[in-house]
């Protein structure tokens, strides 16, 4: 009978989703807390200034509301601190091999042949108006050594979600205007 055992003492980072995926060759690709991650960012003892939000769309569109959004630069720093991960290959003998650079990795899936990774990362600017699934996103195919083989998509921040005629939400990228016809 086989038994379960710990492969690595390193801490997994599951802040943005499932931290591990099988490679198919008796190894895992996992998101780890970066080994050089420092202490949690500390808030300034007094506010730096007011937080002002302004709507400049020029129209009275309906807007979705969301709970638990980032509210300040300190929230941004906390989010980046805890969401930043280092991808690594973990063999069944416990060897951990880093893959690429650390970043805000929201997903990493191993290809069926175990040779490639589909990696989704988030980047700044963050928003105080929409949740993280609307933050700037890059989807890339990585080789197992972390080399970017191909960028499949780069999506900018989507701060405005318009409502279509059928009541469906339609994402509008920052700087883009909703076509009126």
Where on the chain are the PLM-derived regions?
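Beta-propeller folds
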Residues: 1-181
């Amino acid at each position: 009978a086989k038994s379960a055992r710990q492969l690595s003492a390193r801490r997994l980072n599951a802040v943005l989703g499932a931290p591990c995926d099988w490679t198919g060759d008796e190894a895992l690709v996992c998101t780890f807390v970066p080994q050089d991650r420092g202490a949690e960012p500390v808030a300034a003892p007094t506010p730096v200034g007011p937080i002002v939000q302004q709507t400049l769309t020029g129209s009275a569109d309906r807007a979705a509301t969301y709970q638990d959004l980032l509210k300040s630069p300190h929230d941004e720093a906390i989010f980046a601190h805890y969401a930043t991960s280092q991808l690594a290959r973990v063999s069944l003998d416990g060897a951990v091999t880093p893959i690429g650079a650390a970043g805000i990795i929201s997903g990493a899936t191993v290809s069926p042949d175990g040779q490639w990774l589909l990696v989704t990362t988030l980047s700044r600017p963050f928003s105080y108006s929409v949740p993280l699934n609307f933050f700037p996103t890059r989807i890339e195919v990585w080789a197992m050594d972390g080399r970017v083989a191909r960028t499949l998509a780069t999506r900018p921040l989507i701060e405005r979600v318009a409502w279509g005629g059928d009541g469906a939400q339609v994402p509008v990228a920052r700087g883009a205007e909703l076509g009126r016809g």
